[in-house]
UniProtKB/Swiss-Prot annotation:
Keywords: Cell membrane, Membrane, Transmembrane, Transmembrane helix. The chain crosses the membrane at residues 64-84, 125-145, 169-189, 230-250. It is a multi-pass membrane protein. Its main location: membrane. GO terms for cellular component: plasma membrane. This is Uncharacterized protein MG323.1. It comes from the Bacteria. It is found in: Cell membrane.
Amino acid sequence: MLKKKNQFDYLNLSHVLSKKKNSGGGWINKISDKLSEINVAEYQVVSKHSNYLFYSRFGLLDTFVYFLFFLCFFLNNVLFLAGVFHTKQFTFNEVNGFNQFYLFWTVEKPTDIIQASITYQISQYGIANLVFGLISLALLVFLSFRWTVSLFFKSQTTKWERIGYTTGFFISIVVYLLWILLMVLFLVLLDQQFFERDTQKIQSATRFSLFFNVENNNGVYLSKLNSFGVFATAWAISLVFYSFFFIAIFAFNYNKTKLKQLFKKSKAK
């Protein structure tokens, strides 16, 4: 049950909403009215059910988006790490070995190894990795928007909890946006500056892509992460662990009332 102060806020919001519906206005006012309707509906549900997240269509939407974000967030980073650690050694005289060297790109080996250039194209694996990242970023922005406008969330948290969660959300958006930009650069930018296409230069150069160096051992080429690749890999690993932090936040808020009751009982004893 909400506190009296929060009930007053919602009832006052309902009173304002009844005035706004006949006020007309442009699309901004219509959006504002719709958001007010959602907030009033949230109050009507939470006043009857303590488990708002599973009894309200708005709560179900928030819960669904939350776990969909976690899934896409997790898969994006796991796919990247799997692709990074999947690299194998290859030689230029193999028929198919060179094509399987990276999961992120489809590599067309030229017939004339000495004179021709290698063609790179992002693979379905690389596209899937990028799509999961873009979807999770969009979902994170949506969750941050819901956190900002929802009076239900504001009523269920203290001032310092709201400050902490809001700060965490926006920091997460910035960090994850930088990560997605890095993925776009890594997967999509098939520029000569980053990806060596001339086979003669590959045999003497060490940098094969943005994240990898290639060592030549008597015609056998072995890929290793360069310093930038190590940094990106460490970043991805930290994001995998960070994704579980969102599950912890959800579990804490879902059980916060019960946890407070247990804490009070243990303190009373």
